[in-house]
Amino acid sequence: MAVYAVTGGAGFLGRYIVKLLISADDVQEIRVIDIVEDPQPITSKVKVINYIQCDINDFDKVREALDGVNLIIHTAALVDVFGKYTDNEIMKVNYYGTQTILAACVDLGIKYLIYTSSMEAIGPNKHGDPFIGHEHTLYDISPGHVYAKSKRMAEQLVMKANNSVIMNGAKLYTCCLRPTGIYGEGDKLMKVFYEQCKQHGNIMYRTVDDNAVHSRVYVGNAAWMHVLAAKYIQYPGSEIKGNAYFCYDYSPSCSYDMFNLLLMKPLGIEQGSRIPRWMLKMYACKNDMKRILFRKPSLLNNYTLKISNTTFEVRTNNAELDFNYSPIFNVDVAFERTRKWLEESE
């Protein structure tokens, strides 16, 4: 029986991974490692779940928290394209924090690491080039924001670490998973959009080109892919060692506005008029200036305006081919759970 650690286990995706690990037959203990205290810690009658408050940049505390662990699912990250954190803060957690986790793997002889990367490790790029493809599609990877850059650099670090020698001459095996836009219960950004629509009289004003198609994935299915990858990476001859995979399911691929409308229409939200691009650009520039001068974050800035209006559509079944992944939640269930959470959080 194994001991698993989930860094960022109090977060949006991490919490769902912990929930699913409770049903994993080969897991005896789950260590939930996060810098923040979980206000609603998950409990179980069949698994030992230990919560450890820890900064992943503190090597000594990380080493202590991970001592005795067999496998790490590393989800901890600062996900920010709105200006809440400085560039240095984002790099410190996302890149250097991942360095710390890898160093602990080497020092403690931990043989398996599943890393939560991001679609932004690939794109959309700073040029606004559309992406339609799979893990092996050629694309100009040129990050336009420090968050995307940090996830790209960390992913490369984890991929390079695969098959490296650790304590007692054993090998470290790694795998990277790249969620597309995650949604579901606990999605704070979705909640903000819903609250804005309510404030505008149940109207969703459109800000995104209808042709800017984006792939989405339900949080439960993204979590399941992590749990499944953690199982398969331990098999001799596993295909996933040293590879990266997009997280996907059968959620609709469409623009952000259309996706939100599909999800929220049963909650009484109606489509509104389209805000002119010149006006959005003006507000984005204004918000960028506020961020620079006053450290004031904003959902609308020049970066978010560009990436939301740039197609990023994943068409792949590589996770199914290499580790037998298939979604465990269908779209109807995913949407219903998300709607229920939005209503209950009002």
From Swiss-Prot:
Question: Could you say which EC number(s) this protein's record lists?
Answer: 1.1.1.145, 5.3.3.1
- Keywords on record: Early protein, Host-virus interaction, Isomerase, Multifunctional enzyme, NAD, Oxidoreductase, Steroidogenesis, Viral immunoevasion
Tell me the superkingdom of the source. Viruses
GO MF terms, alphabetically ordered = 3-beta-hydroxy-Delta5-steroid dehydrogenase (NAD+) activity; steroid Delta-isomerase activity
Instruction: Give the induction annotation.
Output: Expressed in the early phase of the viral replicative cycle.
Q: In which pathway does it act?
A: Lipid metabolism; steroid biosynthesis
- Might you name a Gene Ontology BP term for this protein? steroid biosynthetic process
Q: Name one Pfam family in it.
A: 3Beta_HSD
* Catalytic activity, as annotated: a 3beta-hydroxy-Delta(5)-steroid + NAD(+) = a 3-oxo-Delta(5)-steroid + NADH + H(+); a 3-oxo-Delta(5)-steroid = a 3-oxo-Delta(4)-steroid
Active site, renumbered: Y147
Annotated residues for binding of NAD(+): K151
Function statement: Catalyzes the oxidative conversion of Delta(5)-ene-3-beta-hydroxy steroid, and the oxidative conversion of ketosteroids. The 3-beta-HSD enzymatic system plays a crucial role in the biosynthesis of all classes of hormonal steroids. During viral infection, steroid production contributes to virulence by inhibiting the host inflammatory response.
**Family in the record:** Belongs to the 3-beta-HSD family.
**What is the protein name stated in its UniProt record?**
3 beta-hydroxysteroid dehydrogenase/Delta 5-->4-isomerase
